[in-house]
Amino acid sequence: MKIRVSVARQTLSLLADDGQLLREYSVSTAAAGVGEVPGSYRTPRGRHLIRAKIGAGQPENAVFVRRRPTGEIWTPELAAAHPGRDWILTRILWLSGCEPGFNRGFSPQGDCDTMRRYIYIHGSPDSAEMGRPGSHGCIRMRNADLIELFAQVPCYTPVEISED
């Protein structure tokens, strides 16, 4: 199995090993576009893999901070009480770059490591718009879609993030 993320189409495709499309999901990548620099709030490009799966067994809309469940469940009322919070919900697929000097380790411009940038595929509030850029660098998904995807992909599943 492998995953392909299209930034232009704002989709995440789950593919069989032979390339057959198994499922396609609407997602939201970075509002600031693509890039590999820490602090840029951009979605990194290139070859990645799922390094860690976090949140198995957590309820839908479980809130995560620093990859740990807070015990909170997202509601519109909780969101109103924390207006600037970047909501990471339900499950986390933590990505690691596979291309040294591009999205892993260091480049001539400095650190470019996707994992050290804490780039995830994660759940979002149902009010978050999918199908157009809006994240701070991560790949946002609908919670129900992420629960489905999480159950199908093991750690080390390849993830290709492309601009097309």
Model-derived features: where do they sit?
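Extracytoplasmic
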Residues: V7-R9, L22, R45, I88-T90, ...
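A structural motif detector for short, solvent-exposed N-terminal "entry" segments of globular domains
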Residues: M1-G33
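Short, surface-exposed secondary-structure junctions/capping segments
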Residues: V34-K53
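Soluble periplasmic/extracytoplasmic beta-strand elements of cell-envelope proteins
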Residues: R4, S13, L49, I92-W94, ...
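Short, solvent-exposed loop/turn elements at domain surfaces
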Residues: L14, G35-E36, Q58-N61
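Well-ordered beta-strand positions in beta-sheet-rich domains
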Residues: E24-S26, R47, Y118, P158
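Exported/periplasmic cell-wall-interacting domains
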Residues: Q58-D164
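N-terminal post-signal-peptidase region of extra-cytosolic proteins
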Residues: M1, S26-S40, E72-A79
